[in-house]
A protein has these predicted regions:
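Cofactor- and metal-binding active-site motifs of prokaryotic enzymes
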Residues: 99
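Beta-rich carbohydrate-recognition and catalytic domains
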Residues: 1-22, 31-95, 107-160, 165-183
């Protein structure tokens, strides 16, 4: 007789720390340099409540804000360390004035690349739009800093992070806005 419980898969989980008041979400996991790494986002709103009430510090805010983190995960799935992903140099440009969000880790040819959405929410304030501008970017994540390789302009007002497709020493990126477009 076979006991069914022995054939049931086992699930483990890890908890990503809330570094500031921003709530953790959107993890991306990659194995690179002999380490299990996890990039994740901290956002200033709670998606679980069914509405978007933005906050910044101790008060309400009119705009969303993101922080990006990089964590190292141990073999026991415990979070060994966490730190900010540096994007202030990108925030200093008009194109990405509000930073990056939804970082996706892509180990490729010995480098740790990152796909992300670079955002600017000024159109929300100036043009009374509901959503800001965003562009997909490709960067190298090195020493916790995003080093921009290039941004992609598909002429869509909103771009969310694409999905990497690795094959035959080539890296293709699939746009989520248009999943049949490879770049």
């Amino acid at each position: 007789m076979k006991v069914l419980l022995q054939s049931v898969p086992r699930y483990d989980r890890t908890e990503l720390p809330q570094v500031t008041k921003h709530l953790p979400c959107n993890p991306s996991i990659a194995f690179h340099g002999g380490r299990l790494l996890c990039a994740y986002r901290g956002c200033n709103y709670d998606l679980r409540e069914g509405h978007f009430q933005f906050f910044y510090g101790s008060g309400p805010s009119r705009l969303p804000d993101s922080q990006s983190y990089i964590a190292e995960i141990g073999s026991d799935l415990a979070c060994k360390s966490v730190d900010f992903i540096e994007d202030r140099h990108l925030r200093a440009t008009p194109e990405f004035a509000d930073g990056v969000e939804d970082v996706r880790l892509v180990p490729f040819r010995g480098r740790l690349l990152a796909l992300a959405s670079g955002v600017n929410f000024q159109p929300v304030l100036k043009q009374k739009r509901l959503i800001g501008d965003s562009k997909m970017i490709l960067a190298e994540l090195k020493d916790r800093k995003l080093h921009l390789i290039r941004s992609f302009d598909s002429r869509n007002p909103v771009e969310k992070t694409g999905m990497p497709v690795l094959g035959r020493e080539q890296l293709d990126l699939v746009y989520s806005v248009s999943p049949f477009l490879l770049i």
